[in-house]
Amino acid sequence: MREIKKHIFLETISYENRHMSPRNLYIIRGEERSLMVDTSNNTERDWTILKGMIDALGIDCRKLDIFITHEHPDHTGLVPKLQELGARAFMNPDETRKRVDLLHSYLA
């Protein structure tokens, strides 16, 4: 993990699978609340790296907001685990509708 600008931290998750591009995790650490942009895939390895980043920055998940840029699983995969720890997640309503429409297409 490195601080790329004051209070903005970046961790890159690389994969051995050449078909998977690296994932960048960003956290903006604030005094009262912190902001994470996207999460990553829902894998144990990604969770360990992401949780390690949060812990290293001394962030309480109850004071963490997550902004989801779009509905792909490599951006949303770890949201449920973070919500279980008290984090709040936000996503553009258009992306939320896409996710619901996608779910409905699978159920139709």
Language-model regions: role of each:
Residues 55-108:
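Active-site HxH/HxHxD metal-binding segment of metal-dependent hydrolases
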Residues 2-57:
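Conserved beta-strand hairpin/beta-sheet module of binuclear metal-dependent hydrolase folds
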